[in-house]
């Protein structure tokens, strides 16, 4: 499958003499080509994304074949991963055999079925063909003699970048040289870490800034600079001219642009993200490609003309014959006795049953085994939903998989009911913390904030706090200024050495005590005052979005969230909204451990705002008129679940009623035990803890404070399912921290709107998280970010390996691997399980084209559990 077949494009029929039409066509081409890469968020707000989000109109299998062809990237689990999973009992042989039977039934071939099955069974062992066999002179001679056999449609072609076809006199590929230059310019332009000397003319855009400097670049030869001396002033003109001089035809342009974007998907992804953030940079993708392809022309021009592009990929006959000899138990003598037609049939069959098909069957068997094990687990624990015990407190947690063990242990230790909901609690807000002039979106990255909420304090207390904070920040600012200044940077080691040396020693040998001391000291010094929020609507023309909510909006958001989790009656005296956050030291990926539903930030702010709204008399009065009656003695509070240490920190506790105080005290009394159990379960999964842990909570805190710790927690590794239904469906199930859990009561959703919004919002976030972990596991060299210990944080944006690599877009090795040879994360596509009648699922698939496409094309799996408890795979 060719590159351009991935993305549909309109035929270009306009004359080249029409400049305006050329520009419009170029815009369309770049827009279509951009779908082969995913936007990459800065690492400080590490937002989960999956690298194939723009390709979901194609099937997973098609994209896998395409990536294998053009980038040699394999997105199926490796043979070692599959063998390991089978040894652990994660793959049932029965599902593999049924998958093979279905595949054979779908194929047309003219060899005996028994012979084909025997070949496939051996090939499915995923053993490599012996190198001695592949290099056998006898076999290669045989292949030469039968190379005339017509393999029909088995040949394919791919479009190569011209620079990738040429090597310089030193033997270095010109595409590597081109990448080196592009990385340099991207770092200069995108720098977000406040470099003392910024790129000149940066405010005019990437292309113009590059155009102004390129003829002075000493890294280019005199002839290369000469090519670019009188280059067009605008990006579109430059891109058009470069493609023309390279000899790229109209029909190949989009495929050629795609190839350049895939060459450095990290930097290109960051460029794409930036282009979506402001009107001023909306042309950034065109500018990036103009710079890249213009530089390619300058580098390759001495070697032009060259016959490129569509390179016919000849089918290698040797491995196909070798596969029949090794797996099909055919000797060379038997092969020679066959007719040309028989040989051709065997070659065609072996070609079709290639490595991707074999791994696809294994992956599907792995996924089916997981689905069946989950079905059995749920079925064995099903209970009636109408006979609820007395509940003292209700706690709403984020759907994050790390909440599942914590909720399970909490429910065992008291009369508590827990709910699952996206951790932004349905509030589309941008938050501005006390003393900050900036705000950050605290909601899933697929949404845009509609309200700004500011943290407020008493004017006098705020003034004192601001002064203390200024002193605190001035220390960091002074240190940074001295470090970047030519003269003071030489003095800095003498001034800061003793203090930083002491910190290094103490942080290394007593990390838990020192970390706790520093955090408490800073908290004491800052003395943050009690705060409130700007909840009431304020019209401010200086702000892009309104501050606060109208009364109707307050009621609407509370109603919407309560209905989404099915909490509209039988309120407990205490309702706790639990956001979540992580705690780690010296960790560039700290945001990846925070709340994905809050855009890579902690969820406590949203939890506190929502709880405050629920306690407002006017909100309760309006809800009561609609039939949602919250008892007067029911109080909403907010807490933050710290996932690294499995503790609950109270962040908003108003005056409690007597019943609510009793519930609060009960939670406080059981929380140490909950933390102990949850930490023990979690820590035993880490590579360093195979023996019994004496004090799990103490060890968890050490991990959080140790600045040499490369794996403070597993994050969302091993996530595999997203269960949408009532808590009773999974309450007594040990889901091993692998399931996103979202409450849903189909009986309160006659229209299906609630289910649709869960799928469109939290469902999409869960899918992105799942496929990011999947991609980082199966193709770490392309979609992961390598080893944490050798990474370099660059430009305040992300990480690189060394100082001249692609901007690494995925998760580090430590987030998905148990050891060099063993994975921890199981690379399975997300299984979405919905507890609802069949007609609800049918309606969802009928109305939601995007979701239907994801299911049909294999980007997610779908199952349902009807009111009678019957499981159905869709």
UniProtKB/Swiss-Prot annotation:
Cofactor(s), by name: Zn(2+)
Record's keyword terms, sorted? Cell membrane, Membrane, Metal-binding, Transport, Zinc
What cellular component terms from Gene Ontology apply here? Answer: plasma membrane
This protein's superkingdom? Bacteria
What species is this protein from? Bacillus cereus (strain ATCC 10987 / NRS 248)
Annotated binding of Zn(2+), by residue: 398, 400, 580, 595
> What the protein does?
Part of an energy-coupled inorganic carbon pump.
Q: What does the record note on quaternary structure?
A: Forms a complex with DabB.
Q: What is this protein called?
A: Probable inorganic carbon transporter subunit DabA
* GO MF terms, alphabetically ordered: zinc ion binding
Give compartment(s). Cell membrane
Name the HAMAP family for this protein.
Answer: DabA
Indicate the family of this protein: Belongs to the inorganic carbon transporter (TC 9.A.2) DabA family.
Q: How does it sit in the membrane?
A: Peripheral membrane protein
| Entry's transmembrane regions | none
Where is coiled-coil annotated? none
């Amino acid at each position: 499958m060719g590159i351009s077949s991935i993305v549909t494009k309109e035929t270009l029929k306009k004359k080249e003499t029409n400049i305006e039409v050329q520009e419009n066509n170029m815009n369309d081409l770049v827009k279509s080509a951009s779908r082969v890469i995913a936007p990459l968020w800065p690492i400080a707000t590490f937002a989960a994304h999956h690298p194939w989000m723009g390709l979901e109109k194609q099937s997973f299998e098609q994209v896998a074949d395409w990536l294998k062809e053009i980038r040699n990237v394999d997105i199926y689990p490796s043979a070692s991963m599959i063998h390991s999973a089978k040894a652990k009992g994660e793959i049932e042989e029965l599902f593999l055999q049924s998958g093979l039977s279905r595949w054979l039934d779908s194929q047309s071939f003219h060899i005996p079925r028994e012979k084909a099955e025997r070949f496939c069974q051996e090939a499915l062992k995923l053993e490599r063909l012996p190198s001695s066999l592949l290099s056998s002179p006898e076999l290669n001679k045989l292949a030469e003699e039968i190379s005339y056999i017509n393999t029909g449609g088995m040949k394919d072609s791919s479009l190569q970048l011209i620079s990738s076809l040429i090597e310089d006199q030193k033997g270095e590929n010109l595409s590597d040289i081109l990448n080196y230059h592009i990385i340099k310019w991207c770092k200069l332009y995108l720098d977000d870490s406040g470099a003392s000397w910024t790129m000149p003319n940066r405010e005019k855009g990437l292309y113009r800034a590059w155009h102004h400097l390129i003829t002075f670049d000493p890294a280019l030869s005199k002839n290369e600079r000469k090519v670019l001396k009188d280059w067009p002033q605008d990006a579109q003109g430059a891109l058009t001219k470069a493609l023309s001089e390279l000899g790229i035809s109209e029909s190949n342009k989009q495929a050629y642009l795609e190839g350049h974007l895939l060459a450095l998907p990290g930097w290109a992804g960051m460029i794409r993200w930036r282009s979506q953030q402001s009107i001023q940079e909306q042309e950034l993708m065109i500018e990036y490609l103009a710079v890249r392809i213009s530089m390619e022309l300058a580098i390759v021009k001495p070697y032009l003309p060259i016959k490129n592009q569509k390179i016919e990929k000849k089918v290698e006959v040797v491995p196909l014959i070798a596969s029949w000899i090794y797996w099909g138990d055919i000797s060379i003598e038997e092969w020679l006795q066959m007719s040309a037609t028989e040989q051709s049939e065997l070659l065609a069959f072996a070609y079709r049953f290639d490595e991707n098909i074999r791994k696809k069957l294994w992956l599907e068997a792995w996924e089916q085994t997981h689905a069946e094990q989950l079905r059995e687990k749920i079925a064995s624990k099903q209970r009636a939903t109408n006979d609820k015990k007395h509940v003292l407190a209700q706690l709403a947690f984020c759907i994050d998989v790390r909440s599942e063990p914590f909720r399970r242990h909490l429910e065992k230790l008291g009369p508590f009911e827990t709910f699952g909901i996206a951790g932004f609690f349905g509030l589309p807000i941008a938050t501005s913390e006390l003393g900050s002039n900036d705000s950050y979106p605290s909601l899933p990255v697929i949404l845009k904030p509609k309200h700004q909420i500011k943290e407020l304090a008493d004017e006098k207390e705020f003034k004192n706090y601001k002064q203390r904070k200024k002193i605190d920040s001035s220390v960091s600012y002074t240190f940074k200024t001295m470090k970047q200044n030519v003269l003071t940077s030489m003095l800095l080691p003498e001034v800061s050495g003793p203090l930083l040396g002491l910190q290094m020693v103490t942080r290394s040998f007593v990390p838990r005590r020192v970390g706790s001391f520093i955090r408490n000291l800073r908290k004491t010094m800052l003395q943050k005052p009690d705060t409130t929020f700007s909840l009431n609507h304020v019209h401010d023309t200086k702000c892009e979005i309104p501050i606060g909510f109208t009364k109707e909006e307050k009621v609407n958001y509370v109603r919407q969230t309560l209905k989404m989790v099915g909490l509209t009656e039988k309120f407990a005296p205490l309702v706790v909204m639990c956001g979540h956050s992580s705690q780690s030291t010296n960790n560039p990926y700290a945001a990846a451990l925070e709340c994905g539903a809050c855009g890579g930030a902690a969820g406590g702010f949203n939890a506190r705002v929502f709880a405050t709204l629920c306690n407002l008399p006017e909100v309760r009065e309006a809800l009561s008129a609609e039939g949602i009656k919250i008892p007067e003695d029911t109080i909403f509070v907010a807490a933050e679940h710290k996932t690294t240490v499995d503790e609950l920190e109270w962040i908003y506790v108003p005056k409690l009623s007597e019943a609510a105080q009793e519930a609060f005290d009960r939670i406080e009394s059981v929380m140490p035990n909950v933390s102990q159990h949850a930490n023990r379960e979690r820590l035993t999964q880490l590579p360093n803890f195979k023996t019994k842990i004496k004090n799990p909570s103490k060890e968890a805190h050490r991990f959080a404070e140790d600045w040499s710790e490369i794996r403070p927690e597993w994050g969302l590794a091993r996530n595999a399912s997203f269960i949408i239904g009532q808590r009773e469906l999974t309450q007594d199930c040990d889901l091993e921290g692998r399931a996103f859990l979202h409450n849903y009561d189909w009986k309160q959703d006659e229209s299906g709107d609630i289910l649709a919004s869960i799928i469109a919002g939290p469902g999409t976030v869960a899918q992105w998280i799942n496929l990011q972990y999947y991609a980082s596991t199966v193709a770490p060299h392309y979609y992961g970010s390598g080893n944490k210990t050798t990474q370099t944080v660059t430009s305040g944006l992300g990480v690189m390996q060394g100082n001249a690599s692609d901007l690494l877009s995925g998760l580090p090795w430590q987030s998905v691997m148990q050891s060099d040879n063993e994975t921890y994360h199981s690379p399975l596509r997300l299984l979405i399980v919905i507890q609802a009648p069949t007609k609800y699922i049918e309606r969802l698939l009928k109305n939601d084209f995007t979701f239907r496409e994801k299911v049909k094309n294999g980007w997610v799996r779908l199952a349902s559990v009807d009111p009678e408890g019957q499981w159905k795979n869709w």
